[in-house]
């Protein structure tokens, strides 16, 4: 078992983002990297993710990034020997109104620019692709993206970590960071319960705990945990893991097959968030199932797939993805503290967006990032001209308007 040590680069967080950052930095030739995780790998927010990977986006920059990330997932085993269990089952997005049809048309236009294969389905084609959707009379349009799919979060994280270790990264579990030492305007060390370790760079990639870790370095950031839930049913006739991923934005629901069961969740319009000042580096961040919310998702999906009605629930999942007030990633170095770097504010894209965010982070450290990557800098929140109350309300609103699609993208 590895132990913390002095290192040039210290990544804090052993979920999808931290693991991806470790791998991509090492792949770019950076050496002397350690990753510190306070518990076990993929035991917190990443483990609760549904794993959807969608490439169809309304903006060219975001679509190209998700396409590049998906190619990483698709070819990772070939390139490294470790599988991410990416399932390319395709995805269907339904529109129930003319407004939503226009959104799908915008996505299709962007896909044409980026070369992503998509097509609008007739009702007959929709029934062929998704036979368990027995009631589609209210569907005005259906957009098919055949190269989308889903991941298993544990496989994703373990693959990143295994490949990173092969490239020389030290990965340490059960090593909670308790202090970040800043002197002369620069990072000097990190401390765990085992001791103090010199480091030139600390990369905070700890999901909903990222604000608490930044606070250890004297920095306040609006990284807001927002509760997200989904459930998996007992076996339901007709459902299987080869069915496409399904999104119905106007009823705020997503679903896919999980073996012979149904995985169903969504983005309710009255979310639950936590003031980041109330989260410490040791906070547990647990939640009980909200059966009103989960029942609402089930009822909405059953309107289209009546076989779901009455299905028993086998498991529920509650996670706290971190949201930013403007709905954009918080990625890159902090100008005010040399050596402090953020990889946070994933806005529910932590697993699916892990490769893209890590590529952005590597670019942000290159010395010549693109204007888009510069726009993701944590410097937009430093110095603090915002209030925690406003930040929490705005970040929660990003969650609540995830479906239908918000006007900004991470």
Where do the PLM segments sit?
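Active-site lid/adjacent beta-loop-alpha segment flanking the redox-cofactor pocket in flavoenzymes
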Residues: 235-340
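Dinucleotide-binding Rossmann-like beta1-alpha1 core, especially the glycine-rich loop
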Residues: 50-129, 252-255
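Short beta-strand to alpha-helix junction loop
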Residues: 64-67, 94-103, 143-162, 286-293, ...
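Glycine-rich FAD pyrophosphate-binding loop
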Residues: 26-46
């Amino acid at each position: 078992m590895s132990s913390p040590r002095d290192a040039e680069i210290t990544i804090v967080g052993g979920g999808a983002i931290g693991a991806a950052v470790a791998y991509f930095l090492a792949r770019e030739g950076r050496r002397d990297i350690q990753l510190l995780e306070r518990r076990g790998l993929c035991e917190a927010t990443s483990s609760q993710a549904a794993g959807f990977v969608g490439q169809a986006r309304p903006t060219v920059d975001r679509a190209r990034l998700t396409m590049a990330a998906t190619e990483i997932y698709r070819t990772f085993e070939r390139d490294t020997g470790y599988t991410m269990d990416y399932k390319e089952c395709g995805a269907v997005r339904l529109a129930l109104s003319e407004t939503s049809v226009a959104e799908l048309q915008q996505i299709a236009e962007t896909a044409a620019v980026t070369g992503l294969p998509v097509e609008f389905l007739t009702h007959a084609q929709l029934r062929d692709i998704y036979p368990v959707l027995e009631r589609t009379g209210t569907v005005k349009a259906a957009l098919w993206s055949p190269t989308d799919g889903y991941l298993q979060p544990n496989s994703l994280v373990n693959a990143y970590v295994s490949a990173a270790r092969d490239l020389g990264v030290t990965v340490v579990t059960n090593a909670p960071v308790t202090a970040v030492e800043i002197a002369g305007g620069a990072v000097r060390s990190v401390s765990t319960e085992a001791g103090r370790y010199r480091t030139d760079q600390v990369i905070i990639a700890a999901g909903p705990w990222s604000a608490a870790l930044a606070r250890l370095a004297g920095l306040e950031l609006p990284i807001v945990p927002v509760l997200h839930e989904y459930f998996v049913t007992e076996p339901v006739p007709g459902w299987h893991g080869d069915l496409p991923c399904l999104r119905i934005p106007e009823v705020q629901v997503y679903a896919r097959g999980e073996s012979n069961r149904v995985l169903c969740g969504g983005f309710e319009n009255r979310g639950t968030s936590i003031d980041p000042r109330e989260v410490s580096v040791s906070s547990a961040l647990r939640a009980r199932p909200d059966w009103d919310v989960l029942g609402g998702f089930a009822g909405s999906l059953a309107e289209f797939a009546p076989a779901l009605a009455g299905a028993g629930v086998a498991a529920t999942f509650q996670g706290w993805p971190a949201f930013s007030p403007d709905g954009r990633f918080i990625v890159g170095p902090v100008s005010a503290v040399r050596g402090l770097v953020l990889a946070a504010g994933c806005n529910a894209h932590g697993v699916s967006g892990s490769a893209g965010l890590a590529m952005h982070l590597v670019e942000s450290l290159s010395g010549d990032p693109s204007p888009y990557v510069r726009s993701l800098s944590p410097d937009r929140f430093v110095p603090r001209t915002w209030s925690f109350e406003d930040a929490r309300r705005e970040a929660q609103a990003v969650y609540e308007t995830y479906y239908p699609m918000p006007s900004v993208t991470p």
